[in-house]
Amino acid sequence: MEIILVTLCLTTLLALLLLKSILKRTTTNNLNLPPSPWRLPVIGNLHQLSLNTHRSLRSLSLRYGPLMLLHFGRTPVLIVSSADVAHDILKTYDVICANRPKTKVIDKILRGGRDVAFAPYGEYWKQMKSICIQNLLSNKMVRSYKKIREDEIKLMIEKVENASSCSPPSPVNLSQLFMTLTNDIICRAALGRKYSSKEDGIDVENIVRAFSALVGEFPIGEYIPSLSWIDKIRGQDHKMEEVDKRFDEFLERVVKEHEDANKDTRSDLVDTLLTIQSDKSALKLIIWDMFLAGTATSLSFLEWAMTELMRNPKVMKKLQEEIRSSSRQGLFVTEKEAEKMDYLQAVIKEALRLRPPAPLMVPRVFSEDVTLKGYNIPAGTQVIINAWAIQRDTTTWGIDAEEFRPERHLDSILDFQGQDFKFIPFGSGKRICPGIGFTSALIGVTLANIVKRFNWRMDVEPQRVQHDLTEATGLVVFRKFPLIAIPSSA
């Protein structure tokens, strides 16, 4: 009897959910909505997403078009996969869709979006962004960190030299090396000193990776509250609590050190923020944004750029020939020298095109009803722009769009400042990544020096090369497996 009763209840519940879904679809049938794959009751199109969401969204867009409507649970989500549609959204409707959708991760770790990247569009966001740019990310401030960048790159080169001088040369974990480099530079620039797990007991590097992974996930409970128990079983809630705890402990320590320091020696971002921002919670979140802007994107680029160079030895050789002939033998390649190297700049652009650090731009949400390409888009619809798909679009980039070919940029004036919508590795519009200048200043000079001083080969068997290219899940996409390579002195 009990089994029959339970079965009857479940059947009734499913029938009601199905009826509700049908009624909702009937009301939206009066609107001219973008093409959409058939969705299941309750979960919508969530079952069609893979761990590498940018790849599954691109596959769907090839079938349903560059402007496609999906449903994550009951939440309508517009997927944009062409430069043409991205232009309309980021130019015509930039302000209307400048807000961010709220998520559990943002509410929990970022205190409802009190930072810059995820704050609601408005006066608070404008003020916080202005503070960050003026005190850390402006062109003037980025230039002032030149000595810090040079010091840390030279330390990195020393570590590689020690490995290459062994007989035989020792393998180098380039992923770890680049993480330490970018972390130490942003720590010195923004916080006044380095922080490391060895000396301070603070593993900033893994906090950055863990946070990026959390923000890039699509938890079931986010879109279907009644199924939030699944997230607990999968350990997502525990991971969020753990990241929040480690995140807050680190930032609390940073702020306290600066509060206790000699007030006459103020010189870094935290000191400046303490004088103008009384809200300690907001202050800590701004500091965290700088880590994401300055560390995660640079690390992702360097990992994938070196991966592609080692997979394409002809490109590596051509790049090394340019660098070695354009700078004095044995000496450090300066930032000015790197900026004038045409093929190096082409390699940077091609790596950003094929492997954008954030394949999916951070979601936005429409605050008003709009008409886009003849389709009705209701207010409340979320927008995800697939930069990864746009930058591999064969109609824009040619039939070799999947290939790593820097030569395509040599006769082009295309840049990555967000003005040309076929190439938006750092986003565009009002929400463009504020760390673009900081990252640009670091990646070129780092790549130039590590490629000039050493010859490189992957420490992996030929049959495992494809496995070695697996991507991690996250807002910023790193390699899933560390990039291990063997250096030899040039």
From Swiss-Prot:
Chief site of localization: membrane
Bilayer topology: Single-pass membrane protein
Subcellular location, record wording: Membrane
Required cofactor names: heme
Highest taxon of the lineage: Eukaryota
MF terms in GO: heme binding; iron ion binding; monooxygenase activity; oxidoreductase activity, acting on paired donors, with incorporation or reduction of molecular oxygen
Alphabetized UniProt keyword annotations: Heme, Iron, Membrane, Metal-binding, Monooxygenase, Oxidoreductase, Transmembrane, Transmembrane helix
Binding, heme: C433
Pfam family, one: p450
Family assignment from sequence similarity: Belongs to the cytochrome P450 family.
Protein name listed in UniProt: Cytochrome P450 71A19
Organism this protein belongs to: Arabidopsis thaliana
Lineage of the species this protein comes from: Eukaryota, Viridiplantae, Streptophyta, Embryophyta, Tracheophyta
